[in-house]
């Protein structure tokens, strides 16, 4: 019997988005899962760290970052990275890669940028393609498409092509927000993840600062009306057939589900969420419908709001490269659905190869 050749996984992480550190944490989890006893029989992993300058770092240094031998925050570019940089277009480091596993959260990664680059290698990758990634990252475009499909969402207002350096423009926008939406509102950059750049605003006086904070990340801004809701999440994997995980709920100790709540706090996670079976079915159906509409496949996490007073479902957003950190919901959802992290990463590779 001929032994099957191991697949070489090209694990890409880091990047120069503001979610750089989250990407490293996710990559550590995935790297360890591929190097488990069961997966070592099927896979080899080559790691490629992209530092905050945009340099690609070779496998030796990248692995040392993942296993903790090098602290990336304390490493100066001139002292180490200049000697270990690689040129993506040369292709030497990438010749033996069978499949890519990009874990770049945020812009220049999750937005489809890395997917477009990797397409030139003519190798499959874990996750969805350029279009689905770009639409999933852009909150405004995503919500516009969902509105056209009559998928329920909270009331929102779009701000784009406005000069927020102009005081008159800012005052006009504040008046428009107050006129169209009820407080509290959430002010969000259109292209950002992990709740970075987002502010909860409870009155007029705080709107200006929130708009400026979002504008620092993206000139296109989304303002959403805040409701009393539960945070509900659903995992998706698959290609032609999309499978849904158990439904999970996050109860956070802070005022809202901000960056610190996602990664630094002790939130209460309930999987499966304690909700009616009919509502669970509707959430899963909307999750599949929304992913199909945006051409999202491979894997994703779909986030919902469930209004406390009415049990009305609102689609929030789709995350096309959800976190794999120790506090991330996506791997927890699938573990509760029968796939531990070692099985999950292997399954994602199989899906991308259509096995």
UniProtKB/Swiss-Prot annotation:
Function as written in the Swiss-Prot or TrEMBL entry: Cell wall formation.
Sequence similarity: Belongs to the D-alanine--D-alanine ligase family.
Residue ranges occupied by any ATP-grasp domain in the UniProt entry: 143-350
Annotated EC: 6.3.2.4
Annotated localization: Cytoplasm
Gene name as annotated: ddl
GO BP, sorted A to Z: cell wall organization; peptidoglycan biosynthetic process; regulation of cell shape
Predominant localisation class: cytoplasm
Signal peptide range: none
Name the record gives this protein: D-alanine--D-alanine ligase
Names of the cofactor(s): Mg(2+); Mn(2+)
A Pfam entry, by short name: Dala_Dala_lig_N
Cofactor descriptive note: Binds 2 magnesium or manganese ions per subunit.
């Amino acid at each position: 019997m001929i032994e099957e050749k191991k697949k070489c996984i090209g694990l890409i992480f880091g990047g120069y988005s503001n979610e750089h550190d989250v990407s490293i944490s996710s990559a550590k989890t995935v790297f360890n899962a591929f190097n488990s006893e069961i997966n070592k029989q099927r896979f080899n992993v080559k790691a490629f760290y992209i530092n905050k300058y945009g340099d690609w770092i070779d496998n030796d240094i990248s692995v040392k970052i993942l296993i903790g031998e090098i602290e990336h925050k304390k490493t100066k570019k001139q002292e180490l990275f200049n000697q270990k940089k690689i040129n993506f277009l040369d292709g030497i480091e990438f010749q033996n890669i069978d499949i890519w596993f990009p874990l770049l959260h945020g812009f220049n990664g999750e937005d489809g940028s890395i997917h477009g680059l990797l397409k030139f290698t003519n190798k499959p990758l874990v996750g969805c393609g350029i279009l689905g990634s770009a639409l999933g990252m852009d909150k405004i475009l995503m919500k516009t498409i969902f509105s056209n499909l009559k998928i329920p969402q909270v009331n929102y207002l779009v701000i784009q092509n406005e000069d927020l350096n102009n005081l008159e423009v800012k005052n006009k926008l504040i008046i428009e927000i107050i006129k169209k939406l009820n407080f509290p509102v959430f002010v969000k950059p259109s292209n950002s993840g992990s709740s970075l750049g987002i502010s909860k605003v409870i009155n007029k006086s705080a709107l200006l600062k929130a708009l400026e904070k979002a504008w620092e990340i993206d000139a296109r801004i989304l303002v959403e009306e805040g409701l009393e809701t539960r945070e509900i999440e659903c995992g998706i994997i698959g290609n032609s057939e999309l499978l849904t995980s158990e439904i999970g709920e996050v109860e956070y100790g802070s005022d809202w589900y901000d960056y610190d709540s996602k990664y630094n706090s002790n939130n209460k996670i309930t999987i499966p969420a304690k909700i009616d079976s009919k509502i669970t079915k509707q959430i899963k159906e909307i999750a599949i419908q929304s992913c199909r509409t945006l051409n999202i496949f491979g894997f994703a996490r779909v986030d919902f709001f469930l209004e406390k007073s009415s049990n009305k479902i609102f689609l929030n957003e789709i995350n096309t490269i959800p976190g794999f950190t120790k506090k991330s919901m996506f791997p927890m959802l699938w573990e509760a659905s029968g796939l531990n992290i070692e099985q999950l990463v292997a399954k994602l590779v199989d899906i991308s190869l259509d096995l």
